């Protein structure tokens, strides 16, 4: 991942949070995200011909594949920060959408692992994550699975973790 101006060396927490907010706005679900040399490739299910929410009369389901280049990610991060800072009040974690929250807490966990690149998919709120890490003995992939209950528990603990 490119180092974004003003960001620490790796800031998957903020990058993934920004992508998650975008997904919430688009009404996507069951997503797959792959890190590429120049950004991210994302695939997910969306409702075409609707207002962005999942409803039976709101359209039909389509699989979309999106490419987010480094410049797109930087713009998402700037827009997300501007949205959160609008009005000057402390952002309300409760108003954030599911993907903004879940991607943020996954990003925080990923930052702690210090991977070289990432891949994950989500289905029904559960995530499978594959990280590529380089050690003195060489590179290797690591898998981790987070159930929907795991993610919800991590989301519930996130505000306290940020204060620590």
Predicted regions and their residues:
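Amphipathic, interaction-prone secondary-structure segments
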Residues: 16-51, 103-134
């Amino acid at each position: 991942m490119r180092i974004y101006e003003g960001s620490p060396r790796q800031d998957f927490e903020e990058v993934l949070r920004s992508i998650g907010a975008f997904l919430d706005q688009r009404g996507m679900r069951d997503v797959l995200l792959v890190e590429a040399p120049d950004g991210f490739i994302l695939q997910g299910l969306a409702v075409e011909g609707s207002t962005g929410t999942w409803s039976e009369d709101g359209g039909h389901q389509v699989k979309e594949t999106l490419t987010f280049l480094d410049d797109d990610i930087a713009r998402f991060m700037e827009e997300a920060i501007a949205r959160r800072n609008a009005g000057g009040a402390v952002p309300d974690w409760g108003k954030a959408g599911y993907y903004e929250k879940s991607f943020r807490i996954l990003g925080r966990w990923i930052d702690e692992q210090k991977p070289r690149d990432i891949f994950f998919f989500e289905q029904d709120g559960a995530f499978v994550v594959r990280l590529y890490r380089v050690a003195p003995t060489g590179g290797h992939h690591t898998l981790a699975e987070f159930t929907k209950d795991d993610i919800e528990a991590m989301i519930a603990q996130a505000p306290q973790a940020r204060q620590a």
